């Protein structure tokens, strides 16, 4: 990558507080774009709209999903927007490109029984289980992103208000409450997990060496929990975030409150969870309405 692209990625990291996972996706998108430029003997600063259309066709020829193509085009559009702020001679060849529609999907989530099974797995009386449980509790109790979790400092925990201050996308600060189970797991972790007691930094979640845990480290912990949990086959941090939102809506929380807790800028982003909770609404309706079923139906 050239220095402009490296500066762009650094801006996303420092000023917009992008997670390492998101930054890696942006970096991969730029690398693939550079390979196309080299293959077609094109230059970054003279890339035109017709070239952008050819690149779109190139992406589809690689049998990528529409979601992936959409993200890659969005990455390049954002990159050129950044470059235009530095050089007035640069044009954005992707600004008029028709954005491929994303495939609609329903967020995956865990049922309450599955969450109980996951928590049972980390009930073991070991040092590692103390740390693993606090990761699971915080992600489920607050719905925070994994990038927010790994950046929590000890001083961000408020035991008087029972909540945590996190810094989300764009370094936006928000306070998220947590319940009694989560509070207890944090207290037990701080009191009995030896690596956290001997470290020379303020990060709350650490690995077994006392170093601040990484996003990759959190994913490793969650995958390890799943391997030891019967009846649960797949987990990722965002699935716990989806579960947090879905369970709140299923229990009657309003969409605006969930939006605030998740740190979503647009209500439409939170709205995707209503499609999931509608399943619960239908279940309640079928069980409660006197004429929802015929007599011979079960």
From Swiss-Prot:
Gene3D superfamilies (alphabetical): 1.10.150.130, Intergrase catalytic core (1.10.443.10)
Active-site residue list: 145, 169, 238, 241, 264, 273 (o-(3'-phospho-dna)-tyrosine intermediate)
GO cellular component: cytoplasm
PROSITE patterns: CB, TYR_RECOMBINASE
Limits of the Tyr recombinase domain: 105-286
Alphabetical list of SUPFAM superfamilies matching this protein: DNA breaking-rejoining enzymes (SSF56349)
A Gene Ontology biological process term: DNA transposition
Compartment(s): Cytoplasm
Entry keyword set: Cell cycle, Cell division, Chromosome partition, Cytoplasm, DNA integration, DNA recombination, DNA-binding
Domain Core-binding (CB): 1-84
GO terms of molecular function: DNA binding; tyrosine-based site-specific recombinase activity
Domain of life, source organism: Bacteria
Subunit comment: Forms a cyclic heterotetrameric complex composed of two molecules of XerC and two molecules of XerD.
Protein purpose: Site-specific tyrosine recombinase, which acts by catalyzing the cutting and rejoining of the recombining DNA molecules. The XerC-XerD complex is essential to convert dimers of the bacterial chromosome into monomers to permit their segregation at cell division. It also contributes to the segregational stability of plasmids.
Family to which this protein belongs: Belongs to the 'phage' integrase family. XerC subfamily.
The protein's name in its UniProt record: Tyrosine recombinase XerC
């Amino acid at each position: 990558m050239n220095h402009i692209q490296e500066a762009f990625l650094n801006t996303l990291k420092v000023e917009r507080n992008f997670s390492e996972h998101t930054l890696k996706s942006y970096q991969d998108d730029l690398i693939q774009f550079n390979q196309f430029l080299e293959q077609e003997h094109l230059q970054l600063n003279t890339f035109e709209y017709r070239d952008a259309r050819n690149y779109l066709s190139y992406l589809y020829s690689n049998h990528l999903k529409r979601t992936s193509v959409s993200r890659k085009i969005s990455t390049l559009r954002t990159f050129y927007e950044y470059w235009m702020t530095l050089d007035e001679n640069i044009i954005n060849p992707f600004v008029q490109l028709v954005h491929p529609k994303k495939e609609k999907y329903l967020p995956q989530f865990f049922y309450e029984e599955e969450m109980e099974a996951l928590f049972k797995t980390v009930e073991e009386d070991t040092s590692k289980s103390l740390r693993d449980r606090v990761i699971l509790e915080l992600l489920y109790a607050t719905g925070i992103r994994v990038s927010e979790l790994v950046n929590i400092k000890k001083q961000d925990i408020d035991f008087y208000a029972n909540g945590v201050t996190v810094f989300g996308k764009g370094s936006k600060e928000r306070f998220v409450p947590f319940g009694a189970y989560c509070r207890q797991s944090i207290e037990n972790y701080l009191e009995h997990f030896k690596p956290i007691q001997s470290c020379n930094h303020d990060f709350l979640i650490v690995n077994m060496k006392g170093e601040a845990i990484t996003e990759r480290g959190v994913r490793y912990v969650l995958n390890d929990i799943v391997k030891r949990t019967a009846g649960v086959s797949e987990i990722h941090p965002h699935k716990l975030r989806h579960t947090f939102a879905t369970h709140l809506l299923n229990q009657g929380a309003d969409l605006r409150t969930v939006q605030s807790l998740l740190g979503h800028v647009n209500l439409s982003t939170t709205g995707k969870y209503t499609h999931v909770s509608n399943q619960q609404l239908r279940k309640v309706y079928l069980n409660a309405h006197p004429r929802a079923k015929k007599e011979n139906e079960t």
